[in-house]
Curated annotation (Swiss-Prot):
Listed name of the protein: COX assembly mitochondrial protein 2 homolog
Lineage top rank: taxon: Eukaryota
Positions of short motif Cx9C motif 2: 37-47
Primary site of residence: mitochondrion
Region (Disordered): 52-79
Cysteines paired by S-S bonds: C14-C47, C24-C37
PROSITE patterns, per database record: CHCH
Natural source organism: Xenopus tropicalis (Western clawed frog)
Length: 79
């Protein structure tokens, strides 16, 4: 299962992949069940995974920054 595919939640690169997959599904109503759109799906999932990893790294960096600020504030309060 993948996340919400709303365009405002993803990068332009992923939106292109999402739109290609949706177009393939609409043009191939029955062949999509036999793997006609699998390449588009793989491309989309690869892009979504990259977005997820980028968000996760950014969140971790922000968390480390906030933790460091908290530790520095405690040290200054002790002095």
């Amino acid at each position: 299962m993948h996340p919400d595919l709303s365009s405002h939640l993803h990068t332009d690169e992923c939106n292109v992949a999402i739109n290609l997959l949706k177009k393939c599904h609409s043009e191939n109503q029955f062949l999509k069940y036999f793997g006609q759109c699998n390449d588009f799906d793989r491309e989309m999932r690869k892009c979504l995974k990259k977005e997820y990893e980028d968000r996760r790294a950014k969140s971790r960096a922000r968390s480390e920054h906030m933790k460091q600020r908290l530790l520095n504030a405690e040290k200054q309060a002790d002095n």
